[in-house]
C-alpha cells in the first residue's frame, strides 16, 4: 500500500503542496481525459444524438459528485482541525458519519429518479427525439450514482490520512478501466449507449472497492468507527452532519453550478440552435471538466494544509498556502484558455467529425467559452479558501452567485444583446462578475480589519 510521509503542521509549504498536488492532479486529469475519450467514443461510435443525450444526463454525475464533495470537504475540514488538536477518535467519528449519511441520501435519490425516469429526462431538457437515448443511458447510470459519491468522499479521507499517491490510483485505475471497456463495448460489441454507461458503472465500482479496502485495512490514522444508535448519539450525528454540510455546501454548489451550466445551456442551445447546438455545446461540456479538475486539484490539495494550520492558528502558513494556490490557478487557467483556442478545431473534430453544422457551431463558439477559464480558476481557489477556514457563508454566497444566479441571467439575456456569441460568453461573464465581487468583499474585510 502506497503511503506518504506528510506533516501538515511543519513541512515546507511549497514542498507539502507539491506532494499533495502532483498525485491529485494526475489522478483528476487522467479521470477527466478518460471522460473526454468516453465522449469521443459515444460521438463517433453511436452518433451526435447520443452525445447530446449523454450531456442531458450529465447533471446526475454532477449531483453525485457534488454530494460526495459536500460531505468529503465538510468531513475533511472538521477532521483536519480535530487532528491538529490530536483528537483522532472524534475525527474518525466524523468521517464515519459523513460516509453513512451520504450513502443513505444518494441511494434514496437514485430510487426516486428511477421511479420517474421519463419525467426527469424531460425536465432536464430532453427533446422527444432524444428521449429514448436519454432513458437508455439513465437506466445504466442512475443506479450506480452512490458509487460515484463514495469515490469522491473516499479520496478526501485518503488524502487527509497522508496517502495522496494511493488516492491518485483510486482515480487513475478506474479511469483506465473505463477507457478500455468503453472501446470494447461501443466498437467491437456495438452496445451503444448502454455499453458506454456500463463501462462507467464498472469502473466506478472498482474505484469504490479500492477506497473501502484502504479505509478498512490500510489506513494509518483515520478509521471507521462503529456507530451508536442511542438518542444522544443520533442527536450528535445530526448536529455534526449539519455542520459538515454547512462547511461543504459550497463544494456541492460548485458541482450544482456545473449542472446548472449544462442544464440552462442545454435549454438555451436547444432553443436557438436545436440538436446540433446541444451537440456542439456538449463538446465544451466534455472539455470543461479538465479545467475544473485541474483547479479542483489545486483547491483540494491546499485544503487540508490550510485547515490544519488554521486549526493551530498558524496564519503565516495559511496565507503562504493561499498565495501559492492563487498563482497556480492563474497559470493553469491561462494555459487552458490558450490551449482551447489553439486546438479547438482538432478537439471538436474528434467528437463531431470535421464537417457538419454541429462542428461549425463548436469551432466558432468554444473559443469564446474559454475566455472565462482564468477567472473560474481564481474563483474556485478563493471559494475553497473560505471553506477551509470555516467561513462557509461567503463561500456559499459566492458559489450561488457564480454558478446559479449570474450564469442563469447571463444565458437568458446575453443572446438577446449579442446573438449566438452571447450564449458562449454567458459563462465567462458570470465568472468575471463573481471574481470582481470576491475581490471587493476581500478588500472591504481587510479595510475593516
Each PLM stretch: what is its role?
Residues 38-41, 162, 181, 185, ...:
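Hydrophobic side chains within alpha-helical segments
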Residues 72, 141-159, 167-178, 196-211, ...:
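Short runs within selected transmembrane alpha-helices of multi-pass transporters and secretion channels
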Residues 51-111, 148-167, 280-338, 342-344, ...:
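Small-residue-rich hydrophobic transmembrane alpha-helices
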Residues 1-21, 79-144, 188-248, 306-372, ...:
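Short alpha-helical transmembrane segments in multi-pass integral membrane proteins
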Residues 24-77, 141-148, 242-309, 329-336, ...:
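Transmembrane helix-bundle signature of multi-pass secondary active exporters and lipid flippases
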Residues 33-36, 45-48, 82-85, 160-161, ...:
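Helix-loop interface residues and adjacent transmembrane-helix termini in multi-pass membrane transporters
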Residues 36-40, 111, 119, 153-157, ...:
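Alpha-helical transmembrane segments of multipass membrane proteins
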Amino acid at each position: 500500500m502506497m503511503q506518504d510521509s506528510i506533516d501538515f503542521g511543519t513541512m515546507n509549504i511549497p514542498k507539502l503542496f507539491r506532494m499533495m498536488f502532483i498525485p491529485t492532479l494526475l489522478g483528476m486529469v487522467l479521470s477527466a481525459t478518460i471522460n473526454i475519450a468516453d465522449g469521443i467514443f459515444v460521438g463517433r461510435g453511436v452518433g451526435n444524438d447520443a452525445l447530446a443525450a449523454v450531456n442531458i444526463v450529465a447533471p446526475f454525475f454532477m449531483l453525485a459528485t457534488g454530494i460526495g464533495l459536500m460531505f468529503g470537504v465538510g468531513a475533511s475540514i472538521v477532521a483536519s482541525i480535530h487532528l491538529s488538536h490530536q483528537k483522532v477518535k472524534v475525527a474518525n467519528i466524523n468521517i464515519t458519519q459523513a460516509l453513512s449519511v451520504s450513502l443513505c441520501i444518494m441511494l434514496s435519490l437514485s430510487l426516486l429518479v428511477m421511479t420517474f425516469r421519463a419525467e426527469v429526462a424531460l425536465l432536464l431538457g430532453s427533446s422527444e427525439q432524444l428521449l429514448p437515448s436519454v432513458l437508455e443511458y439513465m437506466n445504466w447510470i442512475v443506479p450506480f450514482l452512490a458509487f460515484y459519491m463514495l469515490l469522491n468522499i473516499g479520496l478526501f479521507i485518503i488524502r487527509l490520512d497522508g496517502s495522496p499517491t494511493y488516492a491518485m490510483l483510486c482515480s487513475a485505475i478506474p479511469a483506465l478501466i473505463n477507457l478500455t471497456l468503453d472501446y470494447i463495448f461501443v466498437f467491437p460489441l456495438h452496445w451503444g449507449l448502454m455499453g458506454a454507461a456500463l463501462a462507467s458503472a464498472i469502473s466506478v465500482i472498482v474505484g469504490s472497492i479500492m477506497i473501502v479496502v484502504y479505509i478498512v485495512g490500510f489506513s494509518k490514522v483515520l478509521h471507521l468507527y462503529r456507530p451508536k444508535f442511542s438518542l444522544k448519539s443520533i442527536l450528535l450525528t445530526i448536529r455534526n452532519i449539519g455542520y459538515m454540510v454547512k462547511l461543504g455546501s459550497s463544494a456541492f454548489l460548485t458541482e450544482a453550478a456545473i449542472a446548472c451550466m449544462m442544464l440552462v445551456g442545454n435549454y438555451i442551445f436547444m432553443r436557438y440552435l436545436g440538436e446540433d447546438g446541444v451537440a456542439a455545446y456538449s463538446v465544451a461540456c466534455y472539455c470543461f471538466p479538465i479545467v475544473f479538475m485541474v483547479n479542483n486539484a489545486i483547491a483540494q490539495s491546499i485544503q487540508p494544509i490550510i485547515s490544519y494550520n488554521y486549526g493551530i492558528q498558524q496564519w503565516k502558513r495559511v496565507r503562504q498556502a493561499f498565495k501559492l494556490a492563487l498563482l497556480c490557478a492563474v497559470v493553469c487557467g491561462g494555459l487552458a484558455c490558450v490551449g482551447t483556442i489553439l486546438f479547438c478545431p482538432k478537439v471538436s473534430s474528434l467528437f463531431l467529425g470535421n464537417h457538419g453544422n454541429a462542428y461549425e457551431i463548436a469551432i466558432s463558439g468554444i473559443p469564446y467559452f474559454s475566455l472565462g477559464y482564468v477567472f473560474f480558476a481564481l474563483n474556485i481557489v478563493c471559494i475553497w479558501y473560505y471553506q477551509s477556514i470555516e467561513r462557509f457563508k461567503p463561500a456559499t454566497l459566492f458559489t450561488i452567485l457564480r454558478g446559479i444566479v449570474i450564469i442563469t441571467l447571463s444565458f437568458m439575456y446575453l443572446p438577446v444583446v449579442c446573438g449566438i456569441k452571447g450564449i458562449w460568453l454567458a459563462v465567462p461573464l458570470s465568472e468575471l462578475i463573481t471574481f470582481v465581487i470576491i475581490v471587493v468583499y476581500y478588500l472591504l474585510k481587510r479595510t475593516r480589519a
